[in-house]
Amino acid sequence: MLSGVTDDGSTQSGSLIDEIVREGARRMNAHDIVQEPDEHARFAAYLDQLQQVAKADEVDLISHVLSDPDQTMAQSAVLRHLDRRAADLHLDPAYAKWSKAMAQAVIGHSFLTRRLHEWSLFRAITLTLSWRPDDLLAASDWLQLKAAVESSTAAIEILAEDGRTKRIRNTATVSLKRQSQR
């Protein structure tokens, strides 16, 4: 398990990234390590650590993952974490506090910021809170497709008519038909 993190991002036994890599390597057998590039080992280790991180340490760990020199890999690991946590929390009142903390952690990473915003929009649609149809229509294909499958009738109707892609429109149309058969 990770040891305490100091202000400069290091731990008692070295940098947090080095410690995560060592932890990931420890969990893999030697044959896998030889064949797998470093960024793959770090990615697996990051996912493992993000899966297990305590709520109080989540922002710090995300910040450290995002400081990895391989930004594509680091952001991918954080994206998976955000999607997993948001899927678990979006119907819960705790989501608001969590999403604010995550927004601070991902400042400067536009794709991650947008994904958090889209999770908040999905939450608003699902819980029938205030939301604007134009925001849904301007959202990514990812959110439109997700909303076409598992959101409010109002959102699904909008997407059946004006969804960005044929796939989104067709998925929304099928969802509406299923809802009417219930």
Stretches with model-predicted labels:
Residues 2-182:
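Alpha-helical scaffold segments
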